[in-house]
Amino acid sequence: MKTADNGTVNGSSKHETGPLEDILEKKPRKSFISRRSFLSKTIALGAGTVGAGLLSNIRAAETGSSLSAGDAALLRFPAALEILEADFWIQYNELGGIQDDEVPGGSGNEAYAEALEVIEDEMGDYIHDNTDDEITHHQFLNAYLVSKGAAPANLDAFRTLMGSTATGVNQNKIGHRLTNLTRLQIDTSWWTRYRDDSHNPDLDPNFVFPQAVPTLAQNRHTAIPRDDADTTHPLFLKAIANTAAFHFPTIEQGGSSLYPALAQKATDVEVLRILMSIGPTETMHFQTWSDVAGNAPPLTAIDPKTGVSVTFPDLEVENELLDKALIMPEPCPFLSRSLPIVSVIRPTNPQGAAMGALRFLRNMGLFIGQSQAFFAYMTQLAQEADAATRGF
């Protein structure tokens, strides 16, 4: 259990999402000169040129890597996603999590935190610890890539989005976010997918799983207070907290599928081990948040700025596809319908998994406001991961 330490709210963090050179300061220096040169050049690039520049530098750096290009790509793409994930979890933590020196923080927003605690009284701890986990994921993946002579993922040039200006945010990060939590369109079909014993997206790619919260999949919704005005509308603030509660598992179920999908392409046994060791932690996050989301209070609220309405239904129902009590993954068809049904993560089909994950996040609205250079860079990383093939 984490406790608040107000004396270190704005202090440095041992898991600060800073330049990779700082993270690697304590690592052995052997053969790091060319990689450090690579880092200094890429970090200095402007957002307008970083797409092409980073991609060409990545290809050049791979020449001396002890990893195959495919295995490096299988780690670099999730490293980039983990950087993005850490970025939005840090935003959640600044406003609604525990403020201490373990993760980068703000000073907290009492009204938002209280709205979250209506859903789960340990919400601040959960947000804090999930934030911590995602930071360690991208730091480890990038450090491992560099230790093998491969280029890391680097998104520093794309930290250009505004983010929230509400009380509690880190003022130094306003205008320097990677992700946008204020215009989300959230696909909650995972809720019914994991309760359905007859369908699996790997076998039924055209089957449409019903939404748990249909209005979240329509229009755009904010999961954090955009400014202090948002906290003055009690019912709408509850809707913001509910939106966050469903955004959390929506993100984490994606990681639960991505890691095992990419692992099927790995050649190096250590790369396989990394993917299979990080992936289950995403599933642990998903399981926690999927349980928490069921506690979101039923309500209907209207965004006072956009006029968009959102309705959170009562999920304490007899319908087994929607019943919030049924949190265990229902057995379903897997590999072939000639085999017995089995409880599994789904989907895990490796074909196009990385591009599918990137499309999912883009359609969610998480990158609204990002540059074309950002999308070019992320698309290239995803395509290279999807192109990887097992070498035996």
For the regions a language model picked out, list residue spans one by one.
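N-terminal export signals
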Residues: 37-59
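Twin-arginine (Tat) signal peptide motif
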Residues: 31-36
